[in-house]
Every structure is written in C-alpha cells, then in structure tokens.
C-alpha cells in the first residue's frame, strides 16, 4: 500500500509522505516515512524546542546547576516535564535557574547578566560546584559569548566547572538536534578530564537512561548483582564528574539510541570502547539485554541466575495482567525510539495489539526499526498533528494510548484512557518489576469504570446508562 493521505490532510498533500500503513510483502525502504525534516507550516505539530531535549539529558544530573540564559519563559519546560528522582534528595527537581533576560539585556547584551547570575547561583548553592549553561533563541541571536563568560567565572572560582551548550531552539528541525549538540559537546570538552577509582574487573557506561521515576536505580540493582561497575550513567541519577570519566569503561551499553547514541559512537571512535544496544522495557527484551551484557564480560551463569530469579518473582504477576489485556488495542505516540522499544514488548509480553504509532522527533532509522518490529495493518506517522490523531483514532479505535500529558489530556476528552509514556504514571517501567508496573497502569487505564462517566450527562434525569459499569475488568 502506498503512503496514506488522510482526509484531514487534503489541503496539505505533502503530509502523505509522512504516514505509512504497513501492508503484506512491501519493501519498507520504498515506503519509509520522511522523518527528521522541517515541519510543514500549518500542520499543528506536536514537536518541541531544542532546549527541552538538551535539558532532558543535562537536567537529570543530580549535582549540577542548570542555568538557562534567556527570558524567564524559556525556563518553564524544565524539571516538571518528567520526573527524574535522584538519591541525593532530588536536588535537580527542586530548582530552576534563569538569567531572566529583559528587553534591555537583549538590546545591550546579556553577558554581564549571565556572569552575575552564575555567581549568584554558586553563592546560593555553596555545596554545588558544577553548572551547565544553555543558550536560548534571544541570547543566540544577539551573539552572547557564553563560553567566554564561563571561562571567566571558572577563573574567578577555581573549584567550579562549567559546561556550555550552544543550541538555541531555532537551530534544528526538531528537539532531536539538542541531543546531538550536547552529546558531541560533552565528549569534545569534558570526557577524559577526570579519573575515578575502578573497583570491578567489569566496567561499563549505561547510556540513554534518565531515571524516570527510578528506572536507573532499579536497573542498577541488576548491575550490582552481576558485579558490574557503572562508570557513568548518561545521565539518570548521574553526576557531572562521573560523565568526565566515561573513557575508563570497557563497554558502552545504549538504551535510548536517539538521545545518546552519538556519544557512544564517539567513545568507540576515539577510545575503542565497543557499543552494545539493548532494550530495557519488557521481559523478553530485558532478559536479552542482560544476556548480551553478560556474554561480553563472560559471566553468562550470573546473568541466567539473575533472569531466573526475576522471572520467578515477577512473571506470575505479569501473566495475570496479560490475561486481562489480551487483544486490547493500543496506539503509541511518543518522541522517537520508544516506538520500537515498546511495540514488540507490549505485543509479546502483554498480548496487546499495537495499531498506530507516531513519532515527534524520530529519524528514518527509528522508523526502519519500528516498522520491522511492527505488524501489518499498523499506521506509522512522523511529526503527527492533532487532526491526524483524531482521524487515526476513528480508523483504528484504540482502547488505550501511550503518550505524554499533552496528547493524553486531549484524548481523554474523547473518552479514551492514556498511560503516560513520557514521565510515567506510577513507574519505574524498565526492567522486570518495571514492566509489571507498566502492565498494571495499562490495566487500570483500560478497565477504570470512571472513564465511562465522561459520556454521561448527570443533569439528565432520564439517563438510564449505569453510572458505574460493573464487570468491566
């Protein structure tokens, strides 16, 4: 089947190249959706600013001030968008720093303002000695030299270290560019500027995991049981200085390839550290990932023992949910790689049928992976918009949608439940225990009788529809 032109896109026919319906015996290379391309004007894109994706990586660090050099509004989309707990009292979730640029600073320059705010932040947080400074659209347009300011502050304060990220919101087609700039900037400027103590014969960097509701901390229990030292978490529950030591690891394990695969590639090129990609959502994928890591280190028996213990503990609970979710239909509308991380895991481990997928900032390689893993009859959408979501919902009639709150609150008005695939409902979702949590939240969303109230007009005394639909589970 060719690419699909939805009815809502008839006035924007260019959108046809971005939507694919998988059919039998088709060469997916011929029908691969266009991705990582500029949004077509007028399409009500769900994409976000590049600053947001830089903060998704850098903002997770637990010991670092995140200074946003720009108007106060640019600091809105920060710590509250996802929940990144840490084991030091959640420092990164308590504060937002902004230089609060005003019109006069735009006219006359904001470098003095930035310098003042950097000193002020370090004075107010005397125990914090690390900072990342981000440019925004206004400060980039007026040419503020944030690197020069950072060098001046570090010279005046020898005990601090500052990293700058120059990637204003307008400099890419989607937020994905922010990932790339931060990855490459970090390895160019900060990797191999510090050494840490190595305490195990097995060492790795765990790359592309941001500790959403404790993902990193749950997986860390696996690595501890296997005797593997994680040199650096990029960046969930991680520290600024640990990331400076990434060159010391024997292996780079990559979870989210879109946000962090760039630094893994550079570590391989510059230091010869091999890259190993895994999926950590789903029982089958998590077990496969553990086996791959253990095979690299030659500790296969330890890995099999860990997998057996986790299966014995959590598989019966997963099977309970699978029995009750079997045959339900799901749409997955997330950022990029989670499409291909989740599609097969929810189908194989939960018996759910994935009927539509949309990516905000995925690249063509992400669509290659998800289409290869997905089933026939599924819609694949790049940079989907609100009207397309409505039409796709009418076509595939999903029982539940995995997405973020922005789209999630929209579909709730259509009486369709959603599970927060960005910040999670009640995570963690990674690992064996985490996937049981995901199954539980999906079950609760699908079978919650309260959602049936949305279609009931309680003011109508003649309404005969039961307020609570019994036996929905």
Curated annotation (Swiss-Prot):
Cofactor info, note text: Binds 1 [8Fe-7S] cluster per heterodimer.
One Gene Ontology molecular-function label: ATP binding
Lineage: Bacteria, Pseudomonadati, Pseudomonadota, Gammaproteobacteria, Pseudomonadales
ATP-binding keyword on record: yes
Record-stated family: Belongs to the NifD/NifK/NifE/NifN family.
Subunit description: Hexamer of two alpha, two beta, and two delta chains.
Species name: Azotobacter chroococcum mcd 1
Cofactor: [8Fe-7S] cluster; [7Fe-V-9S-C-homocitryl] cluster
Protein name (record): Nitrogenase vanadium-iron protein alpha chain
Annotated GO biological process: nitrogen fixation
EC number: 1.18.6.1
Something else known: The structure of the 7Fe-V-9S-C-homocitryl cluster is assumed to be analogous to the 7Fe-Mo-9S-C-homocitryl cluster.
Annotated function: This vanadium-iron protein is part of the nitrogenase complex that catalyzes the key enzymatic reactions in nitrogen fixation.
Domain of life: Bacteria
UniProt keyword list: ATP-binding, Iron, Iron-sulfur, Metal-binding, Nitrogen fixation, Nucleotide-binding, Oxidoreductase, Vanadium
Catalysed reaction equations from the record: N2 + 8 reduced [2Fe-2S]-[ferredoxin] + 16 ATP + 16 H2O = H2 + 8 oxidized [2Fe-2S]-[ferredoxin] + 2 NH4(+) + 16 ADP + 16 phosphate + 6 H(+)
Enzyme's top EC category: oxidoreductase
InterPro entries in UniProt: Nase/OxRdtase_comp1, Nase_asu, Nase_comp1_asu, Nase_comp1_CS, Nase_V-Fe_asu
Binding-site residues, [7Fe-V-9S-C-homocitryl] cluster: 256, 422
SUPFAM superfamilies cross-referenced by the UniProt entry: Helical backbone' metal receptor
One Pfam family hit: Oxidored_nitro
Binding residue positions for [8Fe-7S] cluster: 49, 74, 137
């Amino acid at each position: 089947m060719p690419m699909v032109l939805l009815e809502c896109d008839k006035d924007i026919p260019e959108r046809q190249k971005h939507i694919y319906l998988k059919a039998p015996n088709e060469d997916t290379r011929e029908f691969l959706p266009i991705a990582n391309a500029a949004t077509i004007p007028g399409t009500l894109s769900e994409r976000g600013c590049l600053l947001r994706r830089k903060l998704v990586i850098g903002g997770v660090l637990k010991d670092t001030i995140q200074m946003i050099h720009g108007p106060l509004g640019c600091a809105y989309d920060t710590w509250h968008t996802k929940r990144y707990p840490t084991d030091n009292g959640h420092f990164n979730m308590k504060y937002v720093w902004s230089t609060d640029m005003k019109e006069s600073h735009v006219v006359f320059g904001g470098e003095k303002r930035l310098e003042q705010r950097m000193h002020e932040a370090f004075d107010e947080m005397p125990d914090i000695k690390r900072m990342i400074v981000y440019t925004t659209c206004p400060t980039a347009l007026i040419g503020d030299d944030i690197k020069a300011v950072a060098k001046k502050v570090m010279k005046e304060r020898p005990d601090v270290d500052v990293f700058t990220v120059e990637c204003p919101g307008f400099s890419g087609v989607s937020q994905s560019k922010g990932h790339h700039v931060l990855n490459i900037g970090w390895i160019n400027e900060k990797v191999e500027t510090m050494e840490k103590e190595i305490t195990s014969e097995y060492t790795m960097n765990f790359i592309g995991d941001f500790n959403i509701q404790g993902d990193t901390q749950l997986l860390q229990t696996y690595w501890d049981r296997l005797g593997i030292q994680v040199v650096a978490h990029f960046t969930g529950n991680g520290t600024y200085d640990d990331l400076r030591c990434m060159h010391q690891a024997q292996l780079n394990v990559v979870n989210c390839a879109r946000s962090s695969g760039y630094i893994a590639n550079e570590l391989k090129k510059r230091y010869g550290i091999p890259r190993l990609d895994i999926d950590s959502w789903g029982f089958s994928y998590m077990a496969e990932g553990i086996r791959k890591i253990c095979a690299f280190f030659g500790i296969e028996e330890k890995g099999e023992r860990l997998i057996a213990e986790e299966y014995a503990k959590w598989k019966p609970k997963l099977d309970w949910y699978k029995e009750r979710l079997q045959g339900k239909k799901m749409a997955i509308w997330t950022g990029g790689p989670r499409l291909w991380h989740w599609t097969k895991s929810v189908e194989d481990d939960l018996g759910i049928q994935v009927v539509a997928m949309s990516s905000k900032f995925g690249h063509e390689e992400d669509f290659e992976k998800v289409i290869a893993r997905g089933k026939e009859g599924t819609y694949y959408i790049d940079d989907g918009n609100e009207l397309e979501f409505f039409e796709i919902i009418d076509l595939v009639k999903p029982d539940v949608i995995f997405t973020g709150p922005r789209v999630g609150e929209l579909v709730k008005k259509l009486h369709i439940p959603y599970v927060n695939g960005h910040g999670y409902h009640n995570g963690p979702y990674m690992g064996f225990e985490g996937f049981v949590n995901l199954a539980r939240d999906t079950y609760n969303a699908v079978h919650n009788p309260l959602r049936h109230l949305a279609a009931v007009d309680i003011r109508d005394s003649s309404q005969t529809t039961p307020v609570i639909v019994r036996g929905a589970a």
